[in-house]
Amino acid sequence: MVRPVAWPRPIPEGHSWRALVGDGWPAHVRVLHPASRRIDGVEHPVRWREIAPEGVSIATAGWSEVSGIGLHEGVTGPGWDHEPDVGPSPLILPVLLRQMLPGVPEGRVWIGEWDGWGGRKRPAGSRPLTVPGRRYHVAATSPRKLLTGLNPDRLPDVVWDEAGTFIIVADIDLPSTVVGCQKGIAERLLRCPGLEAVRVDGAAPVVT
C-alpha cells in the first residue's frame, strides 16, 4: 500500500483563502493571473489594476468585478481580448518559484498534480493525497531539479517545501495563485515587479 503524504498545515472548513492553503500561515498572498491583449498578432499581458474601475480593490475583487464580465463567459472587454488563465499559469508559477526556491533551506520540495487532468500518467514516484474537493498525485524533488525541470505544458498544481516556509496552490477554478508563507517571503512577492501580487486576509472568502 502506498502511504499518502500529508498537507503541510491543517485545512479548516469553509471557503476562505486559509481553507485552500491550510491554517496557521503568517501571511497569505494572492497572485493575479494576467489577462491579455492581442496587438499585431502578439499577445501582451494585461494586469488587473490596468482595467479595474475606480474604487475596486483588486485585493478583494473577483475577475467579474474588475472586468465587468464573468469568468468563462467567452467574450472580450475594454482593454483585453482574453481572460486570465485558471490553474497553474506558465506566466506566473515559474516567476513565483524563482522568487521563493533560492531561499529554501536544504531539503525536499513536494509537488502535486491534480488528478483531474485528462490523458496524463501519474508522475513517477508519486503518492496520492486527498484534501477537501481535490485529489493530487504528490512527489518529492529538490529545489534545483524543480527550477531546472519546469515544463510549461505540465506545471504542478501545488508546491510546498519540507521546511514549512511556504505553500503554492494554483487551483483549477481560480484565475489567481494563492500562497501561504512566512512574512519575509510575502514581502518579497509583493515587491516583485514580475508579479501582480496582493496581500489577502486568510479568513476572507475566496473570490474568482
Which role does the model predict for each range below?
Residues 129-185:
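Amphipathic protein-protein interaction modules
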